[in-house]
Amino acid sequence: EISLGLVGSEMCIRDRPGDIKYKDVNGDGVVNDGDIVAIGSTSKPNLIYGLGLSATWKGLDVSLHFQGAGKSQFFTYGKCIWAFTEGQWGNILKGTLDNRWVDAETAQKLGIPANENPNASYPRLSYTDNGNGNTTIYEYKNNYRNSTYWLRNGSYVRLKTIDVGYTLPKKIVNKIHFNNVRIFMTGTNLLTWSSFKLWDPEMGASRGEQYPLAKSITLGLSVNSVSYTH
């Protein structure tokens, strides 16, 4: 939840509008490390599956291979989404700025438009510690603690490979003294369905600083010549 007001707690001493507000899990009236509980599942998928389909019609053939993973969650963190952290003081990604709470004071300092959007995907833009005053320990910073706010679903379904081919009719290939001629196209990692959109969910990466699996398309021609005997 993005807070629209101040919260009195040990964990969040300097909360401002747009900061993350945490639940008082144990109900003692104070939000602190005593409210930390286990959440989510493992970043390694507990379910991996696949499905293969193929069909032919006259000279046309199509083969599909789907791959998926489920029962997986991971926390997102790092400089890709946490503005002005890890020594990256000069720049932030445009996508994280455009969909973030930016109060008028910060906007004026940075020379950018204010964006006090209560439905923003990211909390208040800040370039100083907004936790309990400890500027050296990341875990103590209010907006950048592991929580359900940063927990993401790692499940996905991917069209891993697709192969489409066309075999020329025999009456045509025999005239040019071939036994079989097939034209084909093979694609890899062309489509992915996932609720997670920031980077490739198959990487299982929390920071998004790895190369995603490459998409590829291959065009080919398969030819079998006629064998003659004497």
Over which residues does each language-model region extend?
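Surface-exposed extracellular loop regions of Gram-negative outer-membrane beta-barrel proteins
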Residues: 46-62, 168-170, 222-223
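A generic beta-sheet turn/junction motif
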Residues: 6, 55-59, 212
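Membrane-interface anchoring segments and C-terminal beta-barrel signals
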Residues: 75-77, 114-227
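Outer-envelope exported proteins of Gram-negative bacteria
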Residues: 11, 52-56, 63-69, 165, ...
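Surface-exposed, extracytoplasmic segments of Gram-negative outer-membrane nutrient-acquisition systems
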Residues: 9-10, 14-43, 61-151
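Transmembrane beta-barrel architecture of outer-membrane proteins
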Residues: 44-49, 68-70, 157-160, 215
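Generic recognition of flexible, low-complexity loop/linker segments
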Residues: 38-40, 49-52, 171-172, 206-208
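Single conserved hydrophobic/aromatic residue that forms the stacking wall/gate
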Residues: 1-8, 13, 228-230
